């Protein structure tokens, strides 16, 4: 039978566990609950409520029952990265300031909890197989951070219009920045865009730095050479206010 509450930090990181032991089953954890870097395939015996962070990254949940049986409410960060997940079924309904689900096998964000669609939240789903940002309501939210590098996204349409800190669309097959954010409060990462054909839609305001690839710029501006970085930067500043540096790699 589950204990009702545990007022402590649960740290089971890196213990080679295949399951969460019955001996520590609980209803609520009033600290952080950390089971990262194990071989766990099921969240059975996890608490229903976590007041701190819920950290279950680098396990094998996608090969078992996924996020089912996990917490229903996490007031801190929810991190389920590196689990071979193919769906978000069973994810917590209420999540605090940040949801991180990098390095999985997600082709859709169906099931994304409505609680993450509130202003000033952070969402990261780098290294998945997402092909579209449309249909999730992102455009009506002012995210704190929005990261989706190394996916299959072809259009930025459907994503947030305003991001308060950083936005990362690196290594996606987009052809332009149309439909993307108009205002980025910190850094805009847009490197390794091998299909990029135009700077159209680049945010009108980037308060931090812009990170782009030299090869992408030379494709867009074929008359320039690798020695024309200053000209490329000047051209970009003519169409976009960049408060920090333009980093051309």
Q: Could you tell me what each predicted segment is?
A:
Residues 1-24, 224-249:
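N-terminal capping/linker segments that flank leucine-rich repeat
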Residues 12-16, 29-40, 49-62, 74-85, ...:
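Concave beta-strand-loop units of leucine-rich repeat
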Residues 20, 43-46, 63-70, 88, ...:
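Canonical leucine-rich repeat
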